[in-house]
Amino acid sequence: SYPGGTVKNYFFNTVTYAAVNGSQNIGGYNYVFENCMLVRGDLVTRANGNLWYMWAGSWATQTWHTIDGNKYYFRSSYDAAKGIYGMNIGGVNVEYVFSDEGVWLENFTGIYKSGSYSFWVENGIKNKYPGLVYFEGYYYYFKYNDGNILGPMVKNCTFYTDKTNGLMKAAQYQFDEQGRMIN
């Protein structure tokens, strides 16, 4: 937050010097003002398919914005984050999960596939080491790491489950190709 509260953005007509209100096209970008205050910028799809957000005359960077009820994070490259995107929050790396359209999946809890890996996600945040999880009638195990990948699901193997979260005793269990415990 800023000293004195939240920053409010206004735009003044260059001819009348009056604050603008409603829908406005300024510099080729579409904005919405309510009570003369900027409430929505212009979400722009670039030629490469990436989303950028024009807010108060500048591209949004390293910041969150709520647009039409959806939350987006705009990276330092100006692109909306997609897939799993990590940010350092108070010295802790937090990995958020975004849709292919860049919307934070804040209400998603379940198994999220990324490339050849599957991860456990809680409220749109990847859990780095959930261990044993019971989900939709099956047990799944997410191990600590696979090289530099944290928290991947165990699939198609027998694996010693040491972090059971009190669901069963630590032991070797077999998992199928979908990651479901089968014995």
Task: Give a label for each model feature.
Residues S1-N183:
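Extracellular adhesion/carbohydrate-binding repeat motifs centered on closely spaced tryptophans
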